[in-house]
A protein has these predicted regions:
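P-loop NTPase nucleotide-binding/switch module
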Residues: 102-146, 152-158, 176-231, 245-248, ...
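Short, well-ordered loop/turn sites that connect or cap secondary structure elements
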Residues: 28-31, 66, 129, 135, ...
Length: 353
């Protein structure tokens, strides 16, 4: 982490601390939603407001121990996540850190810990195209077999609009997520992509909702049918079965991939999900259900600011698989606690909720 901080020259100092919101002096070119590393431990945060030479930063980790005068590093980048083979079956926290991998070294997440969800594994890449072919953003270059899924390697958005010539593509073989597998117009393409969590995917037009989402729960499919590409809310008071219904949909829905976001959920309920889901079988493929799921665990005892990011993180991952042509179900439990987090952050900023 210390080596990463040395790469940046834009620094500030902490001027005020209010819970998860830190006020810092900042460079002139600081922008909204820019990533900042706060304090000597490099706590991850995002700029949420800029006022003249000061920036308000929502910190995604515990701010206990921060002091007035501690340094703040402004990176000039937006919050992003590495997307590629190896995501399926993982359990992430609200800012995309792999809890399973972090748990191998300690039962607790140390402050200032930053680790990508993918990396270090080798994957068998099978190219679809040849040298000299012209490709554009979203075109499929090849595939990697991930569990029971075909993980399609796509041309990233950074290539820009229009078709460009592919000057080189790797032969079939094993590659890590950081290996270059293609060169397009002089730009190196790796097995993984980095997507900004806050930036929505470009959409040309919205498609009609003409296909049903079969939830596997008869009372919903008969009396409250859902559509692929649609949205639904399960309202209700405490203990009325909202979480149980959502978990049932996650198990039995006819979506190809399920992103389950535990946003501010009680720790015991999220523990139940983490214990039960790995034991369940996918009846369609006779494989573990977790092979087509990604769990985002951001319980109520985790930092409030990370609840907001967890929803955007889940949507970003879902859009990535959606672009491959898969039907993806996003289940967020619960939106009300996400709204509570937004209200608390607004209160810390002394702004309207």
């Amino acid at each position: 982490m210390k080596e990463k901080i040395r790469l940046y020259d834009d620094k500030g100092q902490i001027k005020g601390i209010s819970g998860s919101v830190v006020t810092s002096s900042c460079p002139v070119n600081t922008t909204i939603y820019e990533v900042a590393y706060v304090g000597n431990e490099g706590l991850l945060g995002e700029v949420v407001r800029v006022r003249k030479n000061f920036a308000d930063i929502q910190v995604y980790e515990d701010t206990t121990g921060l002091r007035i005068g501690d340094r703040v590093i402004f990176t000039g980048e937006l919050l992003s996540i590495k997307l590629g083979p190896g995501l399926l079956g993982q359990v992430l926290d609200g800012i995309g850190r792999p809890l399973g991998k972090l748990g191998e070294s300690s039962p607790y997440i140390s402050k200032g810990t930053h680790r990508d969800a993918i990396g270090g594994e080798s994957w068998s890449f099978e190219p679809y195209l040849n040298k000299g072919d012209r490709v554009g953003p979203g075109d499929i270059l090849g595939e990697v077999t991930e569990k029971s899924f075909s993980h399609r390697i796509m041309v990233p958005l950074k290539i820009g609009a229009g078709k460009c010539e592919m000057t080189w593509i790797a032969p079939a073989g094993n590659y890590s997520s950081d290996d270059v597998v293609c060169e397009i117009d002089g730009q190196a393409i790796k097995l993984h992509q980095k997507w900004n969590v806050r930036v929505p995917r470009n959409v040309e037009k919205k498609l009609d909702l003409d296909r049903p989402l079969i939830t596997g729960t008869r009372v919903l499919d008969v009396f409250y049918p859902l559509a692929l590409g649609g949205t639904a809310v399960i309202p209700g008071g405490f203990g009325t079965g909202k979480t149980v219904t959502q978990q049932s949909i996650a198990r039995w829905a006819n979506a190809d991939i399920v992103i389950y976001i535990g946003c501010g959920e009680r720790g015991n309920e999220m523990t139940e999900v983490l214990e039960e889901f790995p034991k369940l079988k996918d009846v369609r493929k006779d494989a573990p259900l977790m092979d087509r799921m990604i769990l985002i665990a951001n319980t109520s005892n985790m930092p409030v600011a990370a609840r907001e990011a967890s929803i955007y993180l889940g949507m970003t991952i879902a859009e990535y698989y959606r672009d491959m042509g898969y039907d993806v179900a996003i289940i967020a439990d619960s939106i009300s606690r996400w709204a509570e987090a937004l209200r608390e952050i607004s209160g810390r900023l002394e702004a309207m909720p």
